[in-house]
Amino acid sequence: ERELAKMIYDELGVQTKRDLEQYRASDHGDLIGLDGWTIEAKRYAHNAGGNFKPEWWAQVTSAANATATEPVLIFKYDRQPVKCVVFLSSINGEFAGKDNVATISFPTWCMLVREGWADV
């Protein structure tokens, strides 16, 4: 989580930190400080086909629903690039209300965040 917080700061200039409430209550992401997003971070040594586990996505969407924010699952397996999972509607609003997801690179997710700032 600290490594990811540094990556977010380096790319977006936003200071995020671990959400200690995640250990006391359900429906909390791993990092807080990036308005509009619930961030769940996962890192594992071995992958299962290089994809994310459905329970990881369920965890972050539950937390995002509780706070009315966009969920992002950011995961990394050893010797693999960081990947991000978002609702397709985060990329294209025409998919709003659907459960379709997209797996994108970390720089692409940062671009989505920056574009969201431009829309405000």
What is the role of each PLM region?
Residues 1-120:
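Catalytic phosphate/metal-binding cores of nucleic-acid and nucleotide-processing enzymes, i.e., regions
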